[in-house]
């Protein structure tokens, strides 16, 4: 019995040490982002493009929307100037690579917060600023009133690499 307790204690101690080092490394990486942003003098902010109300550039290159406002708030808080932002338009496919590679400092665009993104990619979500839902649009004259009326071979479109795609696959796989 004593031998088992000793082995368990060793395993727990090993995990505690590994956790301490990994937490220290994550904290160091996060502080480097802030440190590098301050040295650079501007925040590199990843946004979507052409999504009025969220992030959209006009013909003159002036950005507007709630996601843009978040970027400006971060610049004001960290650099003392809300105009110290460089916006980088990113697709759903590009957004996480740009963030994890350090191409951008923060990501402020339509992105669903999921457990797998939190755990697997290692992202830190700061909070939800918009709640949405999902549904299907069909032509008015199609006669389709619900998804139960979809026939085999019905075409459905969505953006690849999004939570919407995964939810749609789950929905149809369950039928």
Label the predicted regions.
Residues 61, 122-124, 173:
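Short low-complexity, flexible loop/linker segments enriched in glycine and/or proline
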Residues 58, 118, 172:
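Short, flexible helix/strand-to-coil boundary loops that buttress conserved ligand/catalytic motifs
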Residues 44-53, 63-78, 112, 132-175:
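Bilobed "Venus flytrap"/periplasmic-binding protein-like clamshell domains
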């Amino acid at each position: 019995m004593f031998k088992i307790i000793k082995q368990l204690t060793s395993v727990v101690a090993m995990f505690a040490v590994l956790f301490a080092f990994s937490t220290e490394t994550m904290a160091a990486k996060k502080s480097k982002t802030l440190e590098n942003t301050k040295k650079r003098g501007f925040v590199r902010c990843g946004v979507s493009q052409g999504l009025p109300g969220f992030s959209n550039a006009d013909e003159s290159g002036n950005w507007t929307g709630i996601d843009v406002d978040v970027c400006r708030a971060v610049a004001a808080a960290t650099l003392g100037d809300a105009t110290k932002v460089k916006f980088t338009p990113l697709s759903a496919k590009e957004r996480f690579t740009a963030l994890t590679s350090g191409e951008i400092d923060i990501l402020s665009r339509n992105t669903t917060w999921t457990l797998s993104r939190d755990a697997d990619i290692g992202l830190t979500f700061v909070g939800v600023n918009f709640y949405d839902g999902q549904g299907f649009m069909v032509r008015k004259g199609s006669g389709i009133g619900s998804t139960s009326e979809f026939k085999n071979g019905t075409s459905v479109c969505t953006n690849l690499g999004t939570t919407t795609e995964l939810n749609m696959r789950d929905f149809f796989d369950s039928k």
